[in-house]
UniProtKB/Swiss-Prot annotation:
InterPro entries: YabA
HAMAP family in the cross-refs: YabA
Family per record: Belongs to the YabA family.
GO biological process, alphabetically ordered: DNA replication
Name the UniProt record assigns to this protein: Replication initiation control protein YabA
Subunit structure, as described in the record: Homotetramer. Interacts with both DnaA and DnaN, acting as a bridge between these two proteins.
Positions of Zn(2+) binding: 87, 89, 103, 106
Role noted for this protein: Involved in control of chromosome replication initiation. Inhibits the cooperative binding of DnaA to the oriC region, thus negatively regulating initiation of chromosome replication. Inhibits the ability of DnaA-ATP to form a helix on DNA; does not disassemble preformed DnaA-DNA helices. Decreases the residence time of DnaA on the chromosome at its binding sites (oriC, replication forks and promoter-binding sites). Tethers DnaA to the replication machinery via the DNA polymerase beta sliding clamp subunit (dnaN).
Necessary cofactors: Zn(2+)
A cellular-component GO term for this protein: nucleoid
Top-rank lineage group of the source organism: Bacteria
Length: 117
């Protein structure tokens, strides 16, 4: 191998090394930007979740107040029994609700609209 061939190979390797280095530098910049954006999105996501939780709590409190105010005294008593963990529906009346699971029949008794037949 001649000295000029060896020199040309060395120049080629140097150019490839520069291209590789430039590629790595570009990837590093892109990765840094992506990580920064990810951190910003995580913070924004956290704030949005907190805000959503506040809105849900406010809505639940408002709904509970509205429902309680719109119920007759007897329905409010049934609602209190239901909230204490007892069935108030005709199918399971008086039995305890397991794990305080909701009962569609009980909810229908409390909140369902009755029509006079």
């Amino acid at each position: 191998m001649s000295k000029t061939d060896l020199y040309e190979q060395l120049l080629t390797i140097e150019q490839q090394a520069k291209l590789t280095f430039d590629g790595i530098t570009e990837m590093k910049a892109v990765l840094s930007k992506v990580l920064e954006e990810n951190a910003e999105l995580e913070i924004e996501n956290k704030h949005l979740r907190e805000h959503l939780q506040e809105l849900q709590q406010t809505t639940e409190e408002t709904d509970t107040k509205d429902l309680s105010q719109g119920l007759s005294k007897s329905k409010q008593n049934l609602q209190n029994l239901y909230e204490e963990g007892f069935h108030i529906c005709p199918y399971f009346y008086g039995s305890r609700r397991e794990n305080d699971e909701p009962c569609a029949f009980c909810n229908d008794v409390i909140y369902g609209e009755r029509t006079a037949d």
